[in-house]
Amino acid sequence: MPDLQRLLFELTSGNDDRAEKVIPQLMGMGELALPALLELTRSELEDHRWWAVRALAVSPHTQIETLLPLLKDPASQVRAATALALGLHPDEAAIPALIETMSDEDSMTAGLAGNALIKIGKPAVAALIETMKEAPLSVRILVLRTLAEIRDHRAIPVLMKSMNEESAVLQYWAQTGLERLGLDMVYIKP
C-alpha cells in the first residue's frame, strides 16, 4: 500500500503534474485516504484545498455533506472545483447550496453550479422555477439555461414567460428550452 503521507506530500507539492499523478494512487487507498483529504480542505493554503477537492471529486467514497461547506470557501478556485465535484456526485441534498452558488461573484463557479444542477436533473426543477421569481438577471440567465438543459415540462410556463423578457439572453434560453421540449413553434404576441 502506498504511503499516505508521501502521496499527500506529492499532492501538495506545488507541481501540478506530480499532484495529478498521485490522485489514482490516493483513490486506490479507498476510504483510508478520506480523513487526510478532508483535513487538507481546511488548510490555510488555497492550493492545498484545491487539490484536496480535486481528489475528493473523483473518489467514489466522497460524501456530499463534506463538499457542501466548500462552496463557501474564500477562494473562488476552490468554490469552482467544489461545484465541479458536486457535478460528479449528483445528489438532491446539494440542490439548495448549488442554487445559492449560482449567485457566486465568480461567474465560472456560478456556471459550474448550474452544470451540477443539470446533472441532478428533474429533482432540481421546482427549486429552479422558484428561484426565477426574484433572482437578479445574471442568476435568472443561469437558471433558465439549467432548466433548458434539464428538459422538464414543468418549466414550460417560466420558459414562455421569459420569451417576453427584454434580455436577449433570457429569450435565447427560453426558446432553446422550448425547442428541446419539442415546442419549437413561432410565438407571436397578440
At which residue positions do the language-model features occur?
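Structural detector for internal amphipathic alpha-helices that build alpha-solenoid repeat scaffolds
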Residues: 1, 9, 16-31, 39, ...
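Phosphate- and divalent-cation-binding pockets in alpha/beta enzyme and binding domains
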Residues: 158
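TPR/TPR-like (Sel1-like) alpha-helical repeat modules
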Residues: 163-168
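Acidic/negatively charged segments and metal-coordination signatures
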Residues: 189
